[in-house]
Amino acid sequence: MARKKEFRYRGYTFEELLNMSLEDFAKLLPARQRRSLKRGLSPEQKKLLRKIRLAKKGKYNKPIRTHSRDMVILPEMVGMTIHVYNGKEFVPVEIKEEMIGHYLGEFALTRKIVQHGSPGVGATRSSMFVAIK
């Protein structure tokens, strides 16, 4: 039976990532995410991080909702369910280890996938001569 492969981010195990400081973790990220962390967290992002830390301790019971789609997913967020706003509603996003280093907004799609129905009368040349019920 195949064993599940242990998760590693840039050669570091999840436990090592949890013990790293934010500055050390930022050095492992791609340039765009590293730049956004280097410039500092916005007040909304700091508020979100505070709520996540409270929820981990069990002191925040409500679902965590945020508009901060540009928040980089940090190792301390893993295991949480965060409701991310997509422009219309809050989409629940369960944070997994593989999501580390991505943005929250990547997992809450803003556009709906088109579900085309059957074409109407007159939609094609051949349907012009189909009798309407």
From Swiss-Prot:
Matches recorded under SUPFAM superfamilies: Ribosomal protein S19
Gene3D superfamilies: 30s Ribosomal Protein S19, Chain A
Keyword Transmembrane on entry: no
Gene Ontology terms: biological process: ribosomal small subunit assembly; translation
Record key words, sorted: Ribonucleoprotein, Ribosomal protein, RNA-binding, rRNA-binding
GO molecular function: rRNA binding; structural constituent of ribosome
InterPro entries the record matches: Ribosomal_uS19, Ribosomal_uS19_bac-type, Ribosomal_uS19_CS, Ribosomal_uS19_euk/arc, Ribosomal_uS19_SF
Keyword rRNA-binding set for record: yes
Taxonomy, superkingdom: Archaea
GO cellular component: cytosolic small ribosomal subunit
Described function: Protein S19 forms a complex with S13 that binds strongly to the 16S ribosomal RNA.
Annotated family: Belongs to the universal ribosomal protein uS19 family.
Stated name of the protein: Small ribosomal subunit protein uS19
